[in-house]
């Protein structure tokens, strides 16, 4: 592990970045300055650090994952080939212990301190490839359109409770809006398929994932997005934890013996897609169907068995990616 001499904590907001610099040999001293959350502002951070004669190759930048507001900083630090660490906000919050009040300067300092104290947990971050960034944005827009379609679709429920003259006022406008949204939805899905098709590596991954029973087109795309093209996770167990399907023990001393259960801190979209995939798999995959029925007959709860199937789907997906060969159902060859 690299021995860093300087730690930079950055609190990100929409318009500005609060930057706090801590030196490894004098952690009781810190410097604070503010820049705009733009490419120009981020480059000024680099300039100010250089003016202070700071070795950027021995500097670790640390900041919270704030979604789209994080992109400019991640992109610029990647271009300068500098080390940075993106940490979940809840992890930093819980590491602070009891605290009273907050402001951006204090938050930036807490982030810098987190990187100093938890250097043994360091896992350097990297920006996803351009195609995966595009897929993520398109997938998010598709989700918005799907939710909007659902909202506008409920308007027809009013038809049975009001007169035709009254309903006609909104029905025509509603129909035009729904038609427009469906066109937008089709365009988004077409563009996503086009991006997959034009990238040989993503196309191969997509086809391999689709070969697994229970995994549809949208699930396959989200697997690629969530794993950053299967570069963000080393194995299926880590991804199962990320997806909220890995079981954990809950016990303490001799009296607390909670059941083994999953944790709610997870990618809820991935978990939802896996749930739908598990329900489809027990209908169309004879092996998983038999497994589900067997466990149910043993008295296991439905959700427990379905969660096991979600984990099996993840294992299968990672297996086909690692082998680079499609999933083959050997169950039908068993005697």
Residues covered by each model-derived region:
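Gly/Thr-rich phosphate-binding beta-strand-loop-beta motif of the actin/hexokinase/Hsp70
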Residues: 2-23, 111
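Nucleic-acid-processing active sites and adjacent nucleic-acid-binding tracks
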Residues: 26-60
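Short, solvent-exposed helix-loop connector elements
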Residues: 52, 123-137, 163-166, 258-261, ...
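Acidic, metal-coordinating catalytic cores used for nucleic-acid/nucleotide bond scission
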Residues: 62-72
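Long, charge-rich intrinsically disordered scaffolds of nucleic-acid metabolism proteins
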Residues: 75, 85, 89-208
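Phosphate-backbone recognition surface of nucleic-acid-processing proteins
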Residues: 207, 211, 217, 221-298, ...
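Low-complexity, acidic/Ser/Thr- and charged residue-rich accessory regions of DNA metabolism proteins
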Residues: 254-255, 292-335
